[in-house]
Amino acid sequence: MGAEVFHSLKKVLGEKGLASGVGDEGGFAPNLGSNIRRAGYTAVISHRVAKYNQLLR
């Protein structure tokens, strides 16, 4: 049953033009950019990326 659900979901995601890439653990890998925006964490992520870039200099 699990395999059928997995393949059905992959088909639905493909039909809707959504990402259907699979992560290491076997689950679908989401589009993190849109999820970050929807959750309201864009400013936090931007700040951390800027801080990380400063460390690389």
From Swiss-Prot:
Biological-process GO terms, alphabetical: glycolytic process
Key words, A-Z: Cytoplasm, Glycolysis, Lyase, Magnesium, Metal-binding, Secreted
Pathway listed: Carbohydrate degradation; glycolysis; pyruvate from D-glyceraldehyde 3-phosphate: step 4/5
Cofactor binding mode and count: Binds a second Mg(2+) ion via substrate during catalysis.
GO molecular function, one term: phosphopyruvate hydratase activity
SUPFAM superfamilies, per database record: Enolase C-terminal domain-like
Keyword Cell membrane attached: no
Family matches, as InterPro entries: Enolase-like_C_sf, Enolase_C
Catalytic site: 25
Documented EC number(s): 4.2.1.11
Cofactor(s) needed: Mg(2+)
Catalyzed chemical reaction(s): (2R)-2-phosphoglycerate = phosphoenolpyruvate + H2O
Lineage top rank: taxon: Bacteria
Broad class of enzyme this protein falls into: lyase
Localization per Swiss-Prot or TrEMBL: Cytoplasm; Secreted; Cell surface
Family: Belongs to the enolase family.
Function comment: Catalyzes the reversible conversion of 2-phosphoglycerate (2-PG) into phosphoenolpyruvate (PEP). It is essential for the degradation of carbohydrates via glycolysis.
UniProt-recorded name of the protein: Enolase
Organism: Clostridioides difficile (Peptoclostridium difficile)
